[in-house]
């Protein structure tokens, strides 16, 4: 049985299933063994495991062949993702919902029950109150979303290595002055997959800046693409600054990806609260990057160990992921 046969079978469920798993591997560590990719995961209980995805083999062929890269040049244009987002926002797209659930079984008991008006409406569904409690100890920093987390130390030269690919914070933010503020700090890279909850919250209480939008294209943020393209300095992204009293100035960024129709943030300048909903992603896997300045936070050791060894750690929205150094001193 050929890879082509596997791909044809997988496309039988519909095109969203291909992007579902391909986006489901954003930013994670990979090892190539006889043409297969092993995605490395960990949980907060000390368990580690590896998975191999068919879609990663598909993307490997797409990104690593001449014909495939010609296709990629078309797919990454913003109009393709806008078109896909428009299609998935139409009422007619509702028929895709049961197909998605067939391929991605979920516990629906925690959802707010209502009739979905489109596939994107389903994708951005709300959870019932209490389903994602926020860590009560304000001396702890929290995850903004359900995700697979990698913690990246930022060097004194502003370099942050995401998987095997080094990025400068200046490239990420398109601002040398702002980038200097995060040298020696930490970057928390949260990879959302299609089966994650795609609403996200503010990580801290403080005065929020306006939203800074950096236009770009829409590569998948799968690690195969990350090996070949500097996706985090090319993809469309949006960020804000949160000036806090106990964690410095925190930068929270949303990164778009292939087939993400749009990033929806609710507020411009405002005073915001930790745990308050910030926004949501339309269809597709995507990424949230949170940057902390030098000496402000200390990530939990298990997250540092897992990230060092190439494992992404599964976390949920509101979960504690580290300590605020200022609170620890008190």
Language-model features: locations:
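Low-complexity, charge- and small-residue-enriched intrinsically disordered regions
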Residues: 18-22, 100
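N-terminal non-cleavable signal-anchor helices
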Residues: 19, 32-34
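Contiguous, well-folded functional domains in the mature portion of proteins
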Residues: 35-330
């Amino acid at each position: 049985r050929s890879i082509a046969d596997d791909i044809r079978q997988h496309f039988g469920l519909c095109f969203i299933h291909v992007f579902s798993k391909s986006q489901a591997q954003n930013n994670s560590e990979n090892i190539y063994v006889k043409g297969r990719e092993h995605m490395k995961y960990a949980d907060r209980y000390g368990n580690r495991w590896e998975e191999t995805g068919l879609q990663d083999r598909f993307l490997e062929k797409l990104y690593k062949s001449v014909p495939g890269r010609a296709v990629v040049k078309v797919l990454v244009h913003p109009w393709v993702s806008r078109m896909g987002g428009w299609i998935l926002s139409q009422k007619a797209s509702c028929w895709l919902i049961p197909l998605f659930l067939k391929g991605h079984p979920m516990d629906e008991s925690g959802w707010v029950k209502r009739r979905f008006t489109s596939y994107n409406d389903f994708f951005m569904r709300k959870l019932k109150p209490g389903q994602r409690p926020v860590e009560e100890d304000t001396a702890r920093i929290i995850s903004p979303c359900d995700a697979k987390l990698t913690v990246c130390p930022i060097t004194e030269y502003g370099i942050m290595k995401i998987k095997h690919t080094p990025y400068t914070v200046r490239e990420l933010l398109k601002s040398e002055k702002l980038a200097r503020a995060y040298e020696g700090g930490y970057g928390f890279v949260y990879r959302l997959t299609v089966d994650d909850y795609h609403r996200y919250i503010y990580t801290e209480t403080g005065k929020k800046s306006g939203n800074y939008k950096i236009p770009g294209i829409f590569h998948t943020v799968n690690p195969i693409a990350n090996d070949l393209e500097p996706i985090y300095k090319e993809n469309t992204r949006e960020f804000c600054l949160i000036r806090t009293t106990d964690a410095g100035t925190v930068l929270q960024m949303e990164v778009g990806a292939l087939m993400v129709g749009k990033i929806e943030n609710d507020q411009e300048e405002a005073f915001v609260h930790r745990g308050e909903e910030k926004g949501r992603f339309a269809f597709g896997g995507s990424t949230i990057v949170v940057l902390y300045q030098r000496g402000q936070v200390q990530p939990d050791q298990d997250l540092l160990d897992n990230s060092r060894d190439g494992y992404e750690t599964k976390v949920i929205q509101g979960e504690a992921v580290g300590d605020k150094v200022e609170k620890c001193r008190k």
